Amino acid sequence: VPIFHFSLTLLCSLLCLTTFYCRANTQGHIPSVRFAVNTPGSAPYLYYDESAKRYQGVVVDFFNADELSSQFRVVYLDSNRARSEDLLKSSSVDLFLSSESWISKPSSFLFSEELIKHESYIYSTTNFEGPFVPEENVSSSICTRYGFVYPALTPYFDREENNIDRVDSSSQSTMAMMLSRGRCDFAIMNEHNARSVMFDPKFCSTEFYQSPNVISRVSLVFVIRSGFTSLIDKIDIALKHFVESGQRQLSFERHSGVNQFPKAKC
């Protein structure tokens, strides 16, 4: 009987060790996918959380969902918008978040289904009397994100006379800070971006107003290196579930809140 118990115990131990090894071995062989981040990111989509010391956002939530997390591991690499295209062409990275209309050579890449409709507005510290019309606001200045493309405003930025002054900044947070301090007359950003930064307590004493009209509307998608069709197929399937299940909506609410403009003083 003691020998039987010993053998049974040994067998169970070996089974446990084998199971543990198989799980560890399986996890160790999950392939990595390299994601280029337009550093320091852009809340609520993808941003670096200083307290947690890692990237957070809707993109992270999407890739951490069960549909994809078991198939590959995402490695987030610091980059910038212009450089990301070159890195993708050279296969140094596998994908990044953008819009097809912002890409210089869209025929060189693959594009996923839409993550979200990206709608940009003009923001001000004073109320708008009506829709924002660029032609009626020449000689003004607009805070922008360095390296970002603004098709609706580019003709006015590029004029030699009667132009609108483009004031570049490194992030949406610094754009809002410059707007609050009068460094520019307006700021342009996506509604989700604006909600995530302008309702921060550091802007407690500032009022922010949103233009009644959308300045630009594009589809935000994952831009994937040419030939990586297996990845785009997996992403598109997961995106459908992410949207239809309500996970996308919950993720946006978690990372940008549910506040509505105008933003009043505290």
Residue ranges and their predicted role:
Residues 7-18:
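Bacterial N-terminal signal peptides
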Residues 27-107, 168, 235, 255:
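Extracytoplasmic small-molecule ligand-binding "clamshell" domains
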Residues 39-41, 117-121, 202-240, 258-266:
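Periplasmic-binding protein-like
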Residues 39-42, 51-52, 100-102, 125-129, ...:
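Short coil/turn segments
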Residues 48-49, 63-70, 135-138, 146-169, ...:
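Ligand-binding cleft/hinge of the Venus flytrap
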Residues 57-69, 130, 134-148, 221-259:
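Extended ligand-binding regions for polar small-molecule ligands
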Residues 60, 73-137, 147-150, 211-214:
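Acidic, polar ligand-binding/catalytic clefts
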Residues 86, 98-108, 155, 185-216:
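A ligand-binding cleft/hinge motif common to bilobed small-molecule-binding domains
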